[in-house]
UniProtKB/Swiss-Prot annotation:
It holds the Pfam family DNA_pol_B. It is found in: Host nucleus. InterPro entries: DNA-dir_DNA_pol_B, DNA-dir_DNA_pol_B_CS, DNA-dir_DNA_pol_B_exonuc, DNA-dir_DNA_pol_B_multi_dom, DNA/RNA_pol_sf, DNA_pol_B_thumb, DNA_pol_palm_dom_sf, DNA_pol_type-B. The keyword Lipid biosynthesis does not apply. It comes from Human herpesvirus 2 (strain 186). PROSITE patterns: DNA_POLYMERASE_B. One of its GO terms (biological process) is DNA-templated DNA replication. Residues 669-688 have a biased composition (Acidic residues). This is DNA polymerase catalytic subunit. Replicates viral genomic DNA. The replication complex is composed of six viral proteins: the DNA polymerase, processivity factor, primase, primase-associated factor, helicase, and ssDNA-binding protein. Additionally, the polymerase contains an intrinsic ribonuclease H (RNase H) activity that specifically degrades RNA/DNA heteroduplexes or duplex DNA substrates in the 5' to 3' direction. Therefore, it can catalyze the excision of the RNA primers that initiate the synthesis of Okazaki fragments at a replication fork during viral DNA replication. Keywords: DNA replication, DNA-binding, DNA-directed DNA polymerase, Endonuclease, Host nucleus, Hydrolase, Multifunctional enzyme, Nuclease, Nucleotidyltransferase, Transferase, Viral DNA replication. Its main location: host cell. The keyword Nucleotidyltransferase applies.
Length: 1240
C-alpha cells in the first residue's frame, strides 16, 4: 500500500499559491518565461485568455491500457463570476465558460501542483502502484500473498488473441480459447496490500430437455446441438457473433428433474456450456422459443460461487497449489487490469476458503457530501446537473479505517479559495480528529477531475453518504459525462471497461430511487439504511441526527449559500464547515448501525455480492440459495425469461441496465416515507398506505387476512400472543414447496390422505402437498438449516468479545431477513420463480390458525374453573369483577386476548405457559405461539392502529401519528397531552372505558361521564389558547415541502403554494425546491380577499411563463373585472353580492407577514384542525363514528361568537356590547330556553 498524505507548507522563498492566482498577469508568448507573481490572496477567477472555441479534452489514447485521465493539457473552464471579487456587483452573476490550454491545477497550503502528476508527495492520500502505465512501487517491492480477503467480485470476457493473453500460462489460455469468462476477486491482504485474483475456467451453462431438442432440431449427438447454437448466433442481428463457431460451446447429457410439482420425474437434459455471457443471454431469449430453457439467466459470478462448495462472496481465501501442483501465476505490472498492488491468475482449484478467519482487514471507507449552487440569473434556483452554469462548489471527503473505525483524513475540495473557521478547526482538534486539508481549484472541471483522480488513487472499498445514490453521485457523474465528456469506466478498481454508473429505477411516492454500480467500490447510502431501520416523521439529516445521535448540526439554509459563496474565502469556509459536518454526522450514523456487517452476512448466506444485496431486492437472495440446494438434490429451475438477468438493451426513457444488474420485477424494495401529502386535499386527510410487502409488485392471490378488531378502550388486561416466524414455520410444518405440490388428484392417488399428503382448498381449487417422508420440501430444508444456523450464532453472542458479538448479531439478523423473504419469493407473479399456490396456501393456513386459536380460547377457557384446571396458579391472580376471556383482534401473526377478572401481573407470569398450551394443542411443530406483551390499557382504533400501555408503564403506539410533521406544534402537543391523560389518569381511564361500553348515539342525549372533566379541561385550555389574542403565532405554524416547481403540481390549491405566490408577488425571497414552506391560516378579511383575487391573476401569468423559474411581475396584477350581476332576492340590501367563502388553502399566509401586519389567525380552522386530529385518535371511544366524536368533544368548549372585525366595529358604534354565553353548549342551550320562555 502506497500513501503520500498531507498538504505541505509553502517552501521557503516561494510565494503562496491559491486558486487562480495570477490570472490577470499578462499572457506569456509561446516559449517566454514568466516570473512568479507576488504573494496575494486569490480573488479573481476570470482568465482573459480563455479560448471560446476548441476541441474537447483529450481522452486517453487507444494504445493506453487505462481509460482514466493521466494527462490533460486542455479542458473546458467553467467558474462562477461571483468569485471575481474586484468586479462590480452587476458583473458577478452567471459563469465564465470557455476553454483553457494548460494542465489542471490544485492549490493547497500555499503550494500549487498539477492534479494528474504523481510525485513522492501529494495533497491527498494515495494507495496506488501504477499510474498512467508507470510503476511507482518502492524498490524491491514484492509482497507475498497467501491469504487475502474478498469484498467484491467482477466478471468479464477475455479472448485468446488479446494482447494480454500472450503473457498467460497455457492452462489459462485454454480457458479463453477462443473466448472465456474471467472472474476477478478484489480484496485486501492482512498487511493492507490491495489484491486482484483473476480466476479462469468458470463457465456459464443452461439446460434444455433432450427429447424436445432432438425432436425439434433433429440432433443425434451433443456436437450437433453446438453447431445449431453457433448457427443461430451467426444469424443474429449485428456483427457481435459473426465469427462464432461450435467450439464456443460444449454440451453434455445429464439427468435432472424440473423443480415444479411432485409428479415430475428425473429425465435427460442437455447441459450447454457457453463461454460468453452475452451469447448465453441471446440464446436463452431467442433460440427455439418453443423449448423451455433452465437456469440460463444465472450469471458467471453465481456459477463460480455455487459450483465450488464453500466459496463465499465476502470472506477470506487462501492461494494454494491446484491440480497437478500448479501454482497461481503472478501478473507482471505491465499486464495489470486493476489499480491493485498485486494481481494473480489462477483457477478455482487454486483457492480455498479460510473459514476460521472472521475479522476484517483495513478496508477504507469514504464518507462524502457535495454542495451545489445554481449559476444562472436566479442563484436560488435548485441546481440541475445538465445545466453548465449550475455548479458543484464543494466536496467533503472523510476517510475512515473500517476495521478500527478511526477517522484518518478530512479533505475539502473547494471551487475557489476557502478558509475554514478557526472555531471549526479548534472543535475538530479538541475531539482528536485530523485537521482538514483544503484543496482549492480555479474551475469546476479541475475540482471534479481532482475528486475522481483521488477516488481512483485512494480507492476506498466502501463509500457512504446521505442520499448520495439519488443526488450526489448522479450530479457528479452527470457533470463529468454530459458537460465535460469524461469517460468513467476507468475510475473504479478496473483501469478500463469497468462499470461506474447510476440508474434510475423508478419512483417511490415522491422520492426518486436509484441504484449505483461501481466496480470495486461498495456504495452504502445511509439514507436508505435510516429509512429502513428508524421510523421518523422527517428523514432530513438534521432530524435524523437529533433523533439517533442526540446531536444537532449547524444548519445553513440553501438560500444563504450564494451570498456566503460570493463573500470571500472566510464565508466560503462557513459553507465548507457545513459540508464537512454533514459528512461527520453520516460517518457517526454508519458506525452506529454498521450496515456493512449485516449486508456482508446476507451476501455470504445468499451467494451474491454486496452490491446486489443492496440494490437487487429480496428475490435474488432466495433464488441463489434455492439454486444451490436444487443442484445438490438433482433439480433444475426453469428460466423465467428476462427476469433474473437485467436488461441488455436500452428501454425508452430509461437508461440501459447491464446484464445481472437490472431491477428485477417483484423485488422487494421498501418504499421510503414521503415527506409530505403533496397532491392531496388541504386538510391532509390520511391516505391509505401502500403495503410495503408488495412494493409495487403484482401479487396474484389474496394476502393474509385479520380478525376484525373490537374497537374501544379496554382497561382490563390484554395479552398479545405472537406466532414465532409465522410464514417460515408454516412452510416447514406443512412441507410446502414447488417440488411437493400437485394440482392433480391422480398424482397422489397411491398415497394415503393426511398421513402422506395435505389436501387443502385455496381459492376454490384443491391443492395437494406431500409430506416430508415422501419428499422433503426444498424450502423447508433451507429454512431449517438457516434457523439452526441462526440459533447456533445467537448462542455464541453472550460468550463472545464485544467486537465479535456485534458481528455475530449482524449475522443472525441477516439470516432472519432472508428467512422472512421466502414467503414473498413464492408469491410474486412475475418474480424469479413464482408459485402462487404455495404463497396462497401459506396465507390460508395462517387464517385458519387464527380462527382455530379464537375458537380454542373461547371454548377452553370460557369459565374460570376451566382456566384453573390448566393453570392452577391462576387461583391467586384474580382481579375484582367478573371473569371472561375473548379474542378482540387478530393481525396476521398476532392475537389480542382480553382477559377480565385477572391481573396484568398474572398474565405476564402465565402468558408463556398459555402460548405453549395452545401451540401443543393446535399446531404442528415448528409452529408455536409466544407471549409477546401484556397491555394494562389498550385503545384499539382499527386494523393495525392502536395505542396501549404495557405492564411497566411503557406506551406502545402502532399506526397512529401523534406528532405529525404537517400539524403545527400546538396541535401536536395537545394531542399528546390528551393521550397521556387518557392512559395515565385512572379517573379519566375509567370514565373513558364506561363511555366506550355504550353505543355512541346514547351519549348524544345524555351527559358525558363526570370523570372526563380533566380531559375536557385540556380541550377548554386549548380553545382558550387558540382564541387568546396574545398567543404565540409560532406555535401555529404549519409547514409543507416544495417538492417540485409550483407549475409541476397537478393540484394547485395547496396552502404552501399560495404562500409561495404571495412571496413572489411581494418580491420577497421565494423558497427553493425541497425547502419546507412555513405558513399559518388566517381569518378571511377584506384585505385577504383582495390578495386572493390578485394571486389568481399571478398564477395565470406564471403558468404561461417560459423557463424553469417563475418571473415575479413588476407589480401585483389587478384582478380581472367582472360584469356586475343583477342582484337577486337573496342579496343583501344595496345589491352587493355576498363574498365567496375562501378555501383553506387560499387563507394561507407567510408567518412573518402575518406577525408584522397583525393579520388575525383563523381560530375556527385551528380548533377544527385540533378536533379533527383528536377524532382520528379517540373515535374508538365512540364506536369509530367521527361525526359523533366531534360533536361530543365540542360539548367541552365554551360557545362564543367571534364577529368579523368590521361587524364588531358597527355593533360597538351602535351601542351594543358583548353578551355573555354559557360555559358550555349545554349551559347556552338552557339559557336560551329560559330566555324564549320569558319572551313568550
Amino acid at each position: 500500500m502506497f500513501c503520500a498524505a498531507g498538504g505541505p507548507a509553502s517552501p521557503g522563498g516561494k510565494s503562496a499559491a491559491r486558486a487562480a492566482s495570477g490570472f490577470f498577469a499578462p499572457h506569456n508568448p509561446r516559449g517566454a518565461t514568466q516570473t512568479a507573481p507576488p504573494p496575494c490572496r486569490r480573488q479573481n477567477f476570470y482568465n482573459p485568455h480563455l479560448a471560446q472555441t476548441g476541441t474537447q479534452p483529450k481522452a486517453p489514447g487507444p494504445a493506453q491500457r487505462h481509460t482514466y485521465y493521466s494527462e490533460c493539457d486542455e479542458f473546458r473552464f467553467i467558474a462562477p463570476r461571483s468569485l471575481d471579487e474586484d468586479a462590480p456587483a452587476e458583473q458577478r452573476t452567471g459563469v465564465h465558460d470557455g476553454r483553457l490550454r494548460r494542465a489542471p491545477k490544485v492549490y493547497c497550503g500555499g503550494d500549487e501542483r498539477d492534479v494528474l502528476r504523481v510525485g513522492p508527495e501529494g495533497f491527498w492520500p494515495r494507495r496506488l502502484r501504477l499510474w498512467g502505465g508507470a510503476d511507482h512501487a518502492p524498490e524491491g517491492f514484492d509482497p507475498t500473498v497467501t491469504v487475502f480477503h474478498v469484498y467484491d467480485i467482477l466478471e468479464h470476457v477475455e479472448h485468446a488473441y488479446s494482447m494480454r493473453a500472450a503473457q498467460l500460462h497455457e492452462r489459462f489460455m485454454d480457458a479463453i480459447t477462443p473466448a472465456g469468462t474471467v472472474i476477478t476477486l478484489l480484496g485486501l491482504t492482512p498487511e493492507g496490500h490491495r489484491v486482484a485474483v483473476h480466476v479462469y475456467g468458470t463457465r456459464q451453462y443452461f439446460y434444455m430437455n433432450k427429447a424436445e431438442v432432438d425432436r425439434h432440431l433433429q440432433c443425434r449427438a451433443p456436437r450437433d446441438l453446438c453447431e445449431r447454437l453457433a448457427a443461430a448466433l451467426r444469424e443474429s442481428p449485428g456483427a457481435s457473433f459473426r465469427g462464432i463457431s461450435a467450439d464456443h460451446f460444449e454440451a453434455e447429457v445429464v439427468e435432472r428433474a424440473d423443480v415444479y410439482y411432485y409428479e415430475t420425474r428425473p429425465t435427460l437434459y442437455y447441459r450447454v456450456f457457453v463461454r460468453s455471457g452475452r451469447a448465453l443471454a441471446y440464446l436463452c431469449d431467442n433460440f427455439c422459443p418453443a423449448i423451455r430453457k433452465y437456469e440460463g439467466g444465472v450469471d458467471a459470478t453465481t456459477r463460480f460461487i455455487l459450483d465450488n462448495p464453500g466459496f463465499v462472496t465476502f470472506g477470506w481465501y487462501r492461494l494454494k497449489p491446484g491440480r497437478g501442483n500448479a501454482p497461481a501465476q503472478p501478473r507482471p505490472p505491465t499486464a495489470f487490469g486493476t489499480s491493485s498492488d498485486v494481481e494473480f491468475n489462477c483457477t478455482a482449484d487454486n483457492l480455498a476458503v479460510e473459514g476460521a478467519m472472521c475479522d476484517l482487514p483495513a478496508y477504507k471507507l469514504m464518507c462524502f457530501d457535495i454542495e451545489c449552487k445554481a449559476g444562472g440569473e436566479d442563484e436560488l434556483a435548485f441546481p440541475v446537473a445538465e445545466r453548465p452554469e449550475d455548479l458543484v462548489i464543494q466536496i467533503s471527503c472523510l476517510l475512515y479505517d473500517l476495521s478500527t473505525t478511526a477517522l484518518e483524513h478530512i479533505l475539502l475540495f473547494s471551487l475557489g479559495s476557502c478558509d475554514l473557521p478557526e472555531s471549526h478547526l479548534s472543535d475538530l482538534a479538541s475531539r482528536g480528529l485530523p485537521a482538514p486539508v483544503v484543496l482549492e481549484f480555479d474551475s469546476e472541471f479541475e475540482m471534479l477531475l481532482a475528486f475522481m483522480t483521488f477516488v481512483k488513487q485512494y480507492g476506498p472499498e466502501f463509500v457512504t453518504g446521505y442520499n448520495i445514490i439519488n443526488f450526489d453521485w448522479p450530479f457528479v457523474l452527470t457533470k463529468l459525462t454530459e458537460i465535460y465528456k469524461v469517460p468513467l469506466d476507468g475510475y473504479g478498481r478496473m483501469n478500463g471497461r469497468g462499470v461506474f454508473r447510476v440508474w434510475d429505477i423508478g419512483q417511490s411516492h415522491f422520492q426518486k430511487r436509484s441504484k449505483i454500480k461501481v466496480n470495486g467500490m461498495v456504495n452504502i447510502d445511509m439514507y436508505g439504511i435510516i429509512t429502513d431501520k428508524v421510523k421518523l416523521s422527517s428523514y432530513k439529516l438534521n432530524a435524523v441526527a437529533e433523533a439517533v445521535l442526540k446531536d444537532k448540526k449547524k444548519d445553513l439554509s440553501y438560500r444563504d449559500i450564494p451570498a456566503y459563496y460570493a463573500s470571500g474565502p472566510a464565508q466560503r469556509g462557513v459553507i465548507g464547515e457545513y459540508c464537512v459536518q454533514d459528512s461527520l454526522l453520516v460517518g457517526q450514523l454508519f458506525f452506529k448501525f454498521l450496515p456493512h456487517l449485516e449486508l456482508s452476512a446476507v451476501a455470504r448466506l445468499a451467494g451474491i455480492n454486496i452490491t446486489r444485496t443492496i440494490y437487487d431486492g429480496q428475490q435474488i437472495r432466495v433464488f441463489t440459495c434455492l439454486l444451490r440446494l436444487a443442484g445438490q438434490k438433482g433439480f433444475i429451475l426453469p428460466d423465467t425469461q428476462g427476469r433474473f438477468r437485467g436488461l441488455d438493451k436500452e428501454a425508452p426513457k430509461r437508461p440501459a441496465v447491464p446484464r445481472g444488474e437490472g431491477e428485477r420485477p417483484g423485488d422487494g424494495n421498501g418504499d421510503e416515507d414521503k415527506d409530505d401529502d403533496e397532491d392531496g386535499d388541504e386538510d391532509g386527510d390520511e391516505r391509505e398506505e401502500v403495503a410495503r410487502e408488495t412494493g409495487g409488485r403484482h401479487v396474484g392471490y389474496q394476502g393474509a387476512r385479520v380478525l376484525d378488531p373490537t374497537s374501544g378502550f379496554h382497561v382490563d388486561p390484554v395479552v398479545v400472543f405472537d406466532f414465532a416466524s409465522l410464514y417460515p414455520s408454516i412452510i416447514q410444518a406443512h412441507n410446502l414447496c414447488f417440488s411437493t405440490l400437485s394440482l392433480r388428484p391422480e398424482a397422489v392417488a397411491h398415497l394415503e390422505a393426511d398421513r402422506d399428503y395435505l389436501e387443502i382448498e385455496v381459492g376454490g381449487r384443491r391443492l395437494f402437498f406431500v409430506k416430508a417422508h415422501v419428499r422433503e420440501s426444498l424450502l423447508s430444508i433451507l429454512l431449517r438449516d438457516w434457523l439452526a444456523m441462526r440459533k447456533q450464532i445467537r448462542s455464541r453472542i453472550p460468550q463472545s468479545p464485544p467486537e465479535e458479538a456485534v458481528l455475530l448479531d449482524k449475522q443472525q439478523a441477516a439470516i432472519k431477513v432472508v428467512c422472512n423473504s421466502v414467503y414473498g419469493f413464492t408469491g410474486v407473479q412475475h418474480g424469479l420463480l413464482p408459485c402462487l399456490h404455495v404463497a396462497a396456501t401459506v396465507t390460508t393456513i395462517g387464517r385458519e390458525m387464527l380462527l382455530a386459536t379464537r375458537a380454542y380460547v373461547h371454548a377452553r377457557w370460557a369459565e374460570f374453573d376451566q382456566l384453573l384446571a390448566d393453570f392452577p396458579e391462576a387461583a391467586g391472580m384474580r382481579a375484582p369483577g367478573p371473569y371472561s376471556m375473548r379474542i378482540i383482534y387478530g393481525d396476521t401473526d398476532s392475537i389480542f386476548v382480553l382477559c377480565r377478572g385477572l391481573t396484568g401481573e398474572a398474565l405476564v407470569a402465565m402468558g408463556d405457559k398459555m402460548a405453549s398450551h395452545i401451540s401443543r394443542a393446535l399446531f404442528l411443530p415448528p409452529i408455536k405461539l409466544e407471549c409477546e406483551k401484556t397491555f394494562t390499557k389498550l385503545l384499539l382504533i382499527a386494523k393495525k392502529k392502536y395505542i396501549g400501555v404495557i405492564c411497566g408503564g411503557k406506551m406502545l403506539i402502532k399506526g397512529v401519528d401523534l406528532v405529525r410533521k404537517n400539524n403545527c406544534a400546538f396541535i401536536n402537543r395537545t394531542s399528546r397531552a390528551l393521550v397521556d391523560l387518557l392512559f395515565y389518569d385512572d379517573t379519566v381511564s375509567g370514565a373513558a372505558a364506561a363511555l366506550a361500553e355504550r353505543p355512541a348515539e346514547e351519549w348524544l342525549a345524555r351527559p358525558l361521564p363526570e370523570g372526563l372533566q380533566a380531559f375536557g379541561a385540556v380541550l377548554v385550555d386549548a380553545h382558550r389558547r387558540i382564541t387568546d389574542p396574545e398567543r404565540d403565532i409560532q406555535d401555529f405554524v404549519l409547514t409543507a415541502e416544495l417538492s417540485r416547481h409550483p407549475r409541476a403540481y397537478t393540484n394547485k390549491r395547496l396552502a404552501h403554494l399560495t404562500v409561495y405566490y404571495k412571496l413572489m408577488a411581494r418580491r420577497a425571497q421565494v423558497p427553493s425546491i425541497k425547502d419546507r414552506i412555513p405558513y399559518v391560516i388566517v381569518a378571511q378579511t377584506r384585505e385577504v380577499e383582495e390578495t386572493v383575487a390578485r394571486l389568481a391573476a399571478l398564477r395565470e401569468l406564471d403558468a404561461a411563463a417560459p423557463g424553469d423559474e417563475p418571473a415575479p411581475p413588476a407589480a401585483l396584477p389587478s384582478p380581472a373585472k367582472r360584469p356586475r350581476e343583477t342582484p337577486s332576492h337573496a342579496d343583501p340590501p344595496g345589491g352587493a353580492s355576498k363574498p365567496r367563502k375562501l378555501l383553506v388553502s387560499e387563507l394561507a399566509e407567510d408567518p412573518g407577514y402575518a406577525i408584522a401586519r397583525g393579520v388575525p389567525l383563523n381560530t375556527d380552522y385551528y380548533f377544527s384542525h385540533l378536533l379533527g386530529a383528536a377524532c382520528v385518535t379517540f373515535k374508538a371511544l365512540f364506536g369509530n363514528n367521527a361525526k359523533i366524536t366531534e360533536s361530543l368533544l365540542k360539548r367541552f368548549i365554551p360557545e362564543t361568537w367571534h364577529p368579523p372585525d368590521d361587524v364588531a366595529a358597527r355593533l360597538r358604534a351602535a351601542g351594543f356590547g358583548p353578551a355573555g354565553a354559557g360555559a358550555t353548549a349545554e349551559e347556552t342551550r338552557r339559557m336560551l330556553h329560559r330566555a324564549f320562555d320569558t319572551l313568550a
